[in-house]
Amino acid sequence: MLIPKENRKAIHQALFQQGVLVAKKDFNLPKHPEVGVPNLQVIKACQSLDSRGYLKTRYNWGWFYYTLTNEGVEYLREYLHLPAEVVPATHKRQVRPAAPRAGRPEPRERSSAADAGYRRAEKKDDGAAPGGFAPSFRGGFGRPVAA
């Protein structure tokens, strides 16, 4: 499919910025909500990149999910004339706040009286079979009883 150069560049820029792109499987959608070009052109451009191994495509519930591969990052970096320091958002490490170094919390003191009822509860025999119960199989319906 012939895609104008400015539309192809807009698709590649949006893909490189985030590292992922989502497109609804609606070929008649006039504009892709994120890129601003016809949705059919977005799908076909991503199909082209996928066939060359620069994207991975997943399809689920009427949506295409495109993710860049390492080869795709290199290709788009060359296509868009970007320096090597620029990477997609999915390839950046997220800075997480450091965990507090307070150490282990002190264990709570337990009162033996509070736990005694829980730990050593008397056995309840409500609904249990009596001690002398001996189950036996007597055959099914219409079968002779073996003695």
Swiss-Prot record:
Keyword Protease set for record: no
Gene3D superfamilies: Winged helix-like DNA-binding domain superfamily/Winged helix DNA-binding domain
Compartmental location: Cytoplasm
Alphabetical UniProt keywords: Cytoplasm, Ribonucleoprotein, Ribosomal protein
Region (Disordered), start-end ranges: 90-147
InterPro entries documented for this protein: Plectin_eS10_N, Ribosomal_eS10, WH-like_DNA-bd_sf
Source superkingdom: Eukaryota
Compositionally biased region (Basic and acidic residues): 103-127
GO molecular function annotations of the record: RNA binding; structural constituent of ribosome
Record-level GO BP terms: cytoplasmic translation
GO CC annotation terms, alphabetical: cytosol; cytosolic small ribosomal subunit
Miscellaneous notes: There are 2 genes for eS10 in S.pombe.
Family, similarity comment: Belongs to the eukaryotic ribosomal protein eS10 family.
Function: Component of the ribosome, a large ribonucleoprotein complex responsible for the synthesis of proteins in the cell. The small ribosomal subunit (SSU) binds messenger RNAs (mRNAs) and translates the encoded message by selecting cognate aminoacyl-transfer RNA (tRNA) molecules. The large subunit (LSU) contains the ribosomal catalytic site termed the peptidyl transferase center (PTC), which catalyzes the formation of peptide bonds, thereby polymerizing the amino acids delivered by tRNAs into a polypeptide chain.
Subunit architecture: Component of the small ribosomal subunit (SSU). Mature yeast ribosomes consist of a small (40S) and a large (60S) subunit. The 40S small subunit contains 1 molecule of ribosomal RNA (18S rRNA) and at least 33 different proteins. The large 60S subunit contains 3 rRNA molecules (25S, 5.8S and 5S rRNA) and at least 46 different proteins. eS10 interacts with GCN1 (via middle region); this interaction is direct and promotes GCN2 kinase activity.
Name of the protein described by the UniProt record: Small ribosomal subunit protein eS10B
Species of origin: Schizosaccharomyces pombe (strain 972 / ATCC 24843)
Organism lineage: Eukaryota, Fungi, Dikarya, Ascomycota, Taphrinomycotina
